């Protein structure tokens, strides 16, 4: 199922185009900036600049932006930036930030057998968990342990403490490179551990697509018990994760039948450091920024850990975080 976003402009009308972009910025209601430091937008607090950075006013404005943005210019989207490492050489094209505006959070229906919540891509996962608890719905408590937004959780099937995002999804809303909105169901996707891909049999979006919201089906619960479960999860995070330092959460996926943190610790790598990028002594699957780490230092730690763990265990750790952008000069 798909619907077309209503564009509040005449797409055939003459426009005063920006020479640099080929886009009429008068058509936009959001904020477009150039040479934006991405370290301000990612949880590692490191990395280069984005050539362009756009904060849409709302979903309709995002559709307009994508429709007019030059098709040969790269597009990426970000929530709280908790799963990205932007290389020091920066990003071409545009990075679109969703967390400030695509934050609708609605109780769509509530019956004796449960309820349905719609959450926009920019809603923090912990906020969705608390919202569900407030409305006596259970099953979303684990989301309190995910340090990102709904959009990112949908894109990677984020999970923790034995639960995963797509176990609760009834359907999702996506937007493609042309600004067209689509509604899809879990059956349209191949869903696995930290992986979500469209089936080949599903007509593809124009060239790529992004999650802009999702409907979550939850079972009936009790507000107090859910609140206590969320509180317990947050307490566990505080005790076991280095929340006092910039990081991106878990860096590596757990290999089948094992844990990345256990393998890293087994190899004696807790506290391993390059510059200001260090493997946490509290949780071995976290790389923290101890001060002024560069993206290159963080990526070098990642590569070194992968090499050492493989050499000692013959297990190649796969990154859970996304490493994007260009290297600076001759680095790496």
Curated annotation (Swiss-Prot):
Domain FAD-binding PCMH-type: 45-243
One Gene Ontology MF term: FAD binding
Compartment(s): Cytoplasm
Cofactor(s) listed in the protein's UniProt record: FAD
Name of the top EC class for this enzyme: oxidoreductase
Annotated Gene Ontology cellular component terms: cytosol
Catalytic reaction list: UDP-N-acetyl-alpha-D-muramate + NADP(+) = UDP-N-acetyl-3-O-(1-carboxyvinyl)-alpha-D-glucosamine + NADPH + H(+)
UniProtKB keywords: Cell cycle, Cell division, Cell shape, Cell wall biogenesis/degradation, Cytoplasm, FAD, Flavoprotein, NADP, Oxidoreductase, Peptidoglycan synthesis
Biological pathway: Cell wall biogenesis; peptidoglycan biosynthesis
Keyword Cell division: yes
EC number(s) given by UniProt: 1.3.1.98
GO biological process entries: cell division; cell wall organization; peptidoglycan biosynthetic process; regulation of cell shape
Residues at the active site: 194, 250, 320
HAMAP family: MurB
Protein family per UniProt: Belongs to the MurB family.
Function: Cell wall formation.
NCBIfam families: murB, PRK13905.1
Record protein name field: UDP-N-acetylenolpyruvoylglucosamine reductase
Organism: Nitrosomonas eutropha (strain DSM 101675 / C91 / Nm57)
């Amino acid at each position: 199922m798909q619907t077309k976003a209503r564009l509040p402009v005449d797409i055939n009308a003459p426009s005063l185009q920006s020479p640099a972009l080929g886009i009429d910025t008068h058509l936009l209601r959001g904020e477009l900036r150039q040479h934006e430091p991405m370290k301000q937008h990612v949880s590692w607090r490191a990395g280069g600049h984005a050539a362009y950075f756009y904060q849409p006013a709302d979903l309709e404005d995002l559709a307009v932006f994508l429709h007019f943005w030059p098709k040969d210019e790269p597009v990426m989207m970000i929530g709280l930036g908790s799963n990205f490492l932007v290389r020091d050489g920066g990003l071409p094209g545009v990075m679109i930030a969703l967390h400030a505006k695509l934050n609708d959070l609605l109780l769509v229906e509530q019956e004796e057998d449960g309820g349905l919540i719609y959450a926009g891509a920019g809603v923090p996962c912990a906020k969705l968990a608390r919202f569900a608890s407030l409305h006596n719905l259970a099953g979303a408590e684990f989301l309190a342990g995910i340090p990102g937004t709904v959009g990112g959780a949908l894109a990677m099937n984020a999970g923790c403490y034995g639960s995963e995002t797509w176990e609760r999804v009834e359907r999702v809303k996506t937007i493609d490179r042309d600004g067209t909105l689509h509604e899809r169901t879990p059956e349209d996707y191949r869903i696995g551990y930290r992986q979500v891909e469209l089936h080949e049999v599903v007509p593809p979006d124009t060239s790529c697509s992004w999650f802009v919201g999702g409907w979550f089906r939850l079972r009936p619960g009790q507000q107090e018990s859910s609140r206590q479960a969320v509180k317990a999860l947050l307490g566990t995070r505080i005790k076991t994760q280095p929340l006092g330092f910039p990081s991106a959460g878990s860096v590596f996926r757990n290999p089948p039948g094992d844990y990345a943190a256990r393998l890293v610790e087994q190899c004696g790598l807790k506290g391993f450091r390059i510059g200001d990028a260090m493997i946490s002594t509290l949780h071995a699957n976290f790389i923290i920024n101890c001060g002024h780490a560069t993206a290159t230092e963080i990526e070098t730690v990642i590569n070194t850990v992968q090499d050492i763990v493989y050499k000692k265990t013959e297990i190649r750790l796969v990154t859970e975080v996304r490493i994007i952008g260009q290297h600076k000069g001759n680095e790496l």
